[in-house]
Amino acid sequence: MYEAVCAHPDGDSTVARLAATAASAGYDGIVVRNWGATSADPDAVGADTDADVVRGTTVSVTDRAGASERIRRRRENAVVVAARASSPSLNRFVAESERVDVLAAPMADGGDVNHVIVKAARTHGVRLEFDFAGVLRASGGDRVQALRGLRKLRELVEHYDAPFVVSGRPASHLHVRSPRELVAVGAEIGFTDAQVRAGLREWTHLAARNRRRLSAEFIAPGVKRGRYEEDP
């Protein structure tokens, strides 16, 4: 199971500190989901912390015109590409973008989803994120609203059997919560223990799949370059 984190400069803690804390909490690795690049070397941090560090990115989607090009450029170098939209209509745009792995925090900051968006995500293989940050780090009405949005998302995801990931979205090592603690949050929105853990493992599956696609041996799904294949 992996956690998806925001490291310095987007967050308060370094990649190394987040990786070490996540490993201690029971994770096998982290996906670094910053808006931009970090100076950390994933391989070096992984060797020092005994946690796999995946180079990810989050694309801010505020308009359709420029978003496709930004997603294309990030896809060339990042192992995991998430995109966060600024409106429900742009949530649909992201859900229909096959270069995107994860529609990040679709219910946050006034966001919303409906059956059309969830079905599009299923069709295009885009994972819908259950971002527990608003439950873990908010209180009062904000926490109630976050729970309400996540319950709605769960009902739609279950009904249409759409792919999903789960994250606490820690921006500091102090925000990292163990899988068991995230399971407890999941129970508040109607998830089972197995569903929350499956959502955490989905980051692992995405990283493994996309690393294969970025490797020199990959040609197309189901096809790898062998001894008789040569570059044209």
From Swiss-Prot:
Subunit structure: Consists of a catalytic RNA component and at least 4-5 protein subunits.
Protein name listed in UniProt: Ribonuclease P protein component 3
Biological processes annotated in GO: tRNA 5'-leader removal
One of the record's GO molecular function terms: ribonuclease P activity
Superkingdom of source: Archaea
Keywords (A to Z) from UniProt: Cytoplasm, Endonuclease, Hydrolase, Nuclease, tRNA processing
Main function: Part of ribonuclease P, a protein complex that generates mature tRNA molecules by cleaving their 5'-ends.
Family: Belongs to the eukaryotic/archaeal RNase P protein component 3 family.
Lineage of the organism: Archaea, Methanobacteriati, Methanobacteriota, Stenosarchaea group, Halobacteria
Alphabetized Pfam families for the sequence: RNase_P_p30 (PF01876)
GO cellular component, one term: ribonuclease P complex
Reaction catalyzed: Endonucleolytic cleavage of RNA, removing 5'-extranucleotides from tRNA precursor
Subcellular location: Cytoplasm
Gene3D superfamilies per UniProt: Metal-dependent hydrolases
EC number, as in UniProt: 3.1.26.5
